[in-house]
Every structure is written in structure tokens, then in C-alpha cells.
């Protein structure tokens, strides 16, 4: 048997360090066993998937030094490697299950399903949708003939226990009563993750599924689908989730999660990959610094610890410092520095702003220094010139951060539209609103267009600086944060409603 592993990211946002973490362990497992590592794009969420995000993911993983044997950009015997290009095949598999009596057509509206969930909740039952939605055959035929919108759901046992076998965790028992009748095919004909994932893993001959522990509760559905189709199931291995220093799940609301952020911060790809390799795993000799080749040579999946590995930027910076001092000659250091700081693509975006303000070339460094920094050395006094009360100032930064977290198309036009809409909704003059934004992003209220800077810096660096500015100001209290979340939800809903009209 040839070992075949895969990583299957969704192109719906910035390339996440969690994706790189799982990709690294899949790659090491495959290479250590002389197998193949496959990259597949899971773009079944057509509303959120973008080609830009896909390219960002591929570029970021390659920047780290991860290479795949098959994928959308390199091809392979199981092409295509984008689920959107395979969508015509999924309906046949879903209907095969209907014909076998393992799935059924569901015509319930979202409103009807909400009522059912509330009724189950009131009865003290799990809110998941169970099999009582199935209709008599004659009614199904009538509704299908009438062209009524429908989905296809899988059937799930009402009682009993499912035993999931895991390489790291042994037997995991999950009550079937907790498992809902998962939608397999959506009303638009696109498969859900669960159907597409199982079908593609089978067709691509995946032997080992190494993924995050957040998928444990989905494992019973996947086991059932393999059973229903009569296919051999891959071996499962659920990796521990990356955590923030406070042990909560790693998320962009608390820490930068984009690989692009760490590249812009000036972290070496070798160091970031090394750090991800230490997330829940260690070398046999406990050495902290190692290359990808060394990790592959010594890799044993059984050495993974199930304790939540903490992704700590302070420790990453320390490790990166070791790499810079111990692995780069002075010439190599200079080459990397020049490539990082003055690569044409990045620098070209700043030239119009710098050239129009500079009188000598020596003016360039002070004018553009904030564009070549990570976190800025700002202090509370830097916001002293603001005309806003302290709590209102914090809300401006907090609401801007939350609003921009939802921005999927990172352009200066969209950034400005978001900030302008917030300014209006909060009844704060645009100039007063933008002042703390300028300080947070540029370190001073006197800089070139801050939205241009935000576009160039990228979403993760922008959000990191806004988050850091809030920390400098002391942030909102727990009580204040709860009230702010409620107020922001109302403001955001009003803005969205206005934009639709």
C-alpha cells in the first residue's frame, strides 16, 4: 500500500497558520512512509470562495517550503483537484444513497427547520435534525416533479454508540443521538463538505486522513458514508488544535493567524515551519531547532502530544532570532533583508506617497518606516490629541477592527467604505474617527492616506496594529466589551441593510 495523505483548504480567506500546521504533519507522514502528499481545494462554498484566496494559499505554503505531489497547479492522475470542477459527479453519489435507502430528499424550509430545532431544544433533545423529515415516496415524486427546492440528507441511527478509531486517541465513543442527518447535497446542486470530502478521499485513494480535532464530531457521519458506499475508510488521526497563550482556540480575533502576516513581519519561512513542527511534537533528542528534512527523517506521528499546543509569537520571534544568527552568513542576511524590505512589488505601492513628500532620498526612511515594521512603538500619549472621549475612542478602534475582520475583498475602496459607514453610524465626524486609526496604523496622525497604507500592509497586519492599539489604551472592560458587541451588531446590521438598499 502506498501511503497517501492530503490537505484540503477552503479558499475563503487568508492562508492560515493552522492550514500550514496540518499540511506539515501530512507531508512529514507521507514522506516518512515513502508516500504521496496531495493538495485539494475544497471550494464548495461558492459564495465565499475566491481565486485570489486560492492563489494566496498555494503561494504561502510554497513560501514555507511545503511541496505537494498532486494538486490544482501541478496536476496528477486524479485531476481535477478543485471540488467546484468535480461538482457534477457528486449528485450521482448522493442519489445512489437515496436509491439504497441511505439518504432522502428533504423539502423543509429554513423557517420550518428553525421551528423543529426549537421544539427539540424545548424537549431537552440535541438540536440536530434527525430522520423525521422523510416523506412518503409518492409525495417526494410529486414535489420533485413540481420542481420544489430540496436538499438530500443522509440517514443516521437514532440510538446507539459510534466508535471512532483514531491513531492518537484510540477508540472515541460518540452517541448517535448527538449526530444530525447531515445535508449531503444542497439545493443549488453543490455538495456539502461531508459528501465531497468522503467521495474525493476515496477517488483519490487517500489512506490516512490527518486533520484537526475539530472534525472529531463529524467522523461518525464520514464513517457512515464509507459504510453506505461500501468503501474502505482511511485511517483517522485528529491533531490537537493550536491555542492562544490563554489556551483558547487560535483565532484572528486574538492573534494574527495569516501566514502572510508572519512573512511581512520578517519571520524566516524555515523558522515558522520549525515552530509549527514543535506544536505538539518533538524531536527524539528534544532539540528545539530543526529543518524540514530533519523533521521528516525523525518523524513519528505517535510522538504527537494531545495537550493543546500554544502558538506564542514571543517564542516564535526567539526561534526566528536563532535561525537568523545561526543559519545565515552576513551575505545571506543582507540578501534576505533586501528581498524582504525592498522587493519591487511591495515598495512600488509606496513610491507615489513617498515621492510626493520627499525632498531628498534620506527622507524616505522616516516617511515609510511604519510600512517596514511589525508592531509600532506607540504609547497612550500618542492618542492625546484625539477629540473623542476615551471610551468612544476605544469603540472606534474596536468597531473598526470587527468590521474589517469581516471584509473579504481587501481594497482601499472597501476599507474606506467600511470606516466611513461606521463613522456615520456612530455619529462621529470622519476626521475625528480617522485620527486614532492613523495613529494605530502609521504611528502618527500625520501620514499619507491611511487606507492606502492599510491596503498595502494587508488585513492581518492592519488588524494586528488595531488590536495592539487597543491593548495600549487598556481595551474595553469585560462589561464594556459585552455591551459593545451588542451595539456593534446593531450598527453593523444597519450598515448592511443600508448597503443592500
From Swiss-Prot:
CDD domains: GluRS_core. InterPro entries: aa-tRNA-synth_I_cd-bd (IPR045462), aa-tRNA-synth_I_codon-bd_sub2 (IPR020751), aa-tRNA-synth_I_CS (IPR001412), aa_tRNA-synth_I_cd-bd_sf (IPR008925), Glu-tRNA-ligase_bac/mito (IPR004527), Glu/Gln-tRNA-synth (IPR000924), Glu/Gln-tRNA-synth_Ib_cat-dom (IPR020058), GluQ/Sye (IPR049940). A motif ('HIGH' region) lies at residues 9-19. GO terms for molecular function: ATP binding; glutamate-tRNA ligase activity; tRNA binding; zinc ion binding. It catalyses: tRNA(Glu) + L-glutamate + ATP = L-glutamyl-tRNA(Glu) + AMP + diphosphate. GO terms for biological process: glutamyl-tRNA aminoacylation. It is an enzyme of class 6 (ligase). ATP binds at residue 252. It is found in: Cytoplasm. Its EC number is 6.1.1.17. Gene3D superfamilies: 1.10.10.350, HUPs. Keywords: Aminoacyl-tRNA synthetase, ATP-binding, Cytoplasm, Ligase, Nucleotide-binding, Protein biosynthesis. Belongs to the class-I aminoacyl-tRNA synthetase family. Glutamate--tRNA ligase type 1 subfamily. Monomer. HAMAP family: Glu_tRNA_synth_type1. Catalyzes the attachment of glutamate to tRNA(Glu) in a two-step reaction: glutamate is first activated by ATP to form Glu-AMP and then transferred to the acceptor end of tRNA(Glu). This is Glutamate--tRNA ligase. The gene is gltX.
Amino acid at each position: 500500500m502506498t501511503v497517501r495523505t492530503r490537505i484540503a483548504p477552503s479558499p475563503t480567506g487568508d492562508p492560515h497558520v493552522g492550514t500550514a500546521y496540518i499540511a506539515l504533519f501530512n507531508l512529514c507522514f507521507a514522506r516518512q512512509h515513502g508516500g504521496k502528499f496531495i493538495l485539494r481545494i475544497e471550494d464548495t462554498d461558492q459564495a465565499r470562495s475566491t481565486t485570489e484566496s486560492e492563489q494566496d494559499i498555494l503561494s504561502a505554503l510554497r513560501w514555507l517550503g511545503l511541496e505537494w505531489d498532486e494538486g490544482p497547479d501541478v496536476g496528477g492522475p486524479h485531476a481535477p483537484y478543485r471540488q467546484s470542477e468535480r461538482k457534477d459527479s457528486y449528485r450521482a453519489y448522493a442519489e445512489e444513497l437515496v436509491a439504497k435507502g441511505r439518504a432522502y430528499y428533504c423539502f423543509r424550509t429554513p423557517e420550518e427547520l428553525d421551528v423543529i430545532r426549537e421544539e427539540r431544544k424545548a424537549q431537552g433533545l440535541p438540536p440536530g435534525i434527525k430522520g423525521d423529515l422523510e416523506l412518503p415516496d409518492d409525495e417526494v415524486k410529486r414535489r420533485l416533479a413540481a420542481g420544489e427546492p430540496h436538499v438530500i440528507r443522509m440517514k443516521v441511527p437514532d440510538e446507539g454508540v459510534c466508535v471512532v478509531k483514531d491513531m492518537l486517541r484510540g477508540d472515541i465513543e460518540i452517541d448517535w443521538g448527538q449526530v444530525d442527518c447531515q445535508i449531503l447535497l444542497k439545493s443549488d446542486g453543490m455538495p456539502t463538505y461531508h459528501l465531497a470530502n468522503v467521495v474525493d478521499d476515496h477517488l483519490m485513494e487517500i489512506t490516512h486522513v490527518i486533520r484537526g480535532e475539530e472534525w472529531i464530531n463529524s467522523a461518525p457521519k464520514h464513517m457512515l458514508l464509507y459504510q453506505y458506499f461500501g468503501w474502505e475508510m482511511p485511517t483517522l488521526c485528529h491533531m490537537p488544535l493550536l491555542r492562544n497563550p490563554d489556551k483558547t482556540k487560535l483565532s484572528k480575533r486574538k492573534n494574527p493567524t495569516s501566514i502572510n502576516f508572519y512573512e511581512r513581519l520578517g519571520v524566516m519561512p524555515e523558522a515558522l515551519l520549525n515552530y509549527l513542527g514543535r506544536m505538539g511534537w518533538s524531536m527524539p533528542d528534544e532539540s528545539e531547532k530543526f529543518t524540514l528534512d530533519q523533521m521528516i527523517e525523525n518523524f513519528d506521528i505517535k510522538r504527537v502530544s494531545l495537550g493543546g499546543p500554544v502558538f506564542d509569537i514571543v517564542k516564535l520571534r526567539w526561534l526566528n532570532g536563532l535561525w537568523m544568527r545561526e543559519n545565515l552568513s552576513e551575505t545571506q542576511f543582507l540578501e534576505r533583508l533586501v528581498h524582504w524590505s525592498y522587493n519591487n512589488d511591495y515598495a512600488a505601492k509606496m513610491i507615489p506617497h513617498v515621492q510626493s513628500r520627499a525632498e531628498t532620498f534620506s527622507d524616505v526612511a522616516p516617511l515609510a518606516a511604519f510600512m517596514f515594521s511589525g508592531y509600532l512603538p506607540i504609547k497612550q500619549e500618542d492618542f492625546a490629541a484625539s477629540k473623542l472621549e476615551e471610551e468612544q475612542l476605544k469603540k472606534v478602534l474596536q468597531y473598526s477592527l470587527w468590521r474589517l475582520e469581516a471584509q473579504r475583498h481587501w481594497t482601499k475602496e472597501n476599507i474606506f467604505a467600511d470606516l466611513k459607514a461606521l463613522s456615520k453610524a456612530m455619529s462621529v465626524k470622519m476626521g475625528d474617527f480617522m485620527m486614532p486609526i492613523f495613529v494605530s496604523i502609521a504611528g502618527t496622525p500625520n501620514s499619507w492616506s491611511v487606507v492606502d497604507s492599510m491596503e498595502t500592509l494587508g488585513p492581518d497586519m492592519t488588524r494586528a496594529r488595531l488590536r495592539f492599539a487597543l491593548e495600549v489604551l487598556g481595551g474595553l472592560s469585560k462589561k464594556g466589551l459585552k455591551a459593545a458587541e451588542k451595539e456593534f451588531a446593531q450598527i453593523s446590521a444597519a450598515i448592511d441593510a443600508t448597503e443592500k438598499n
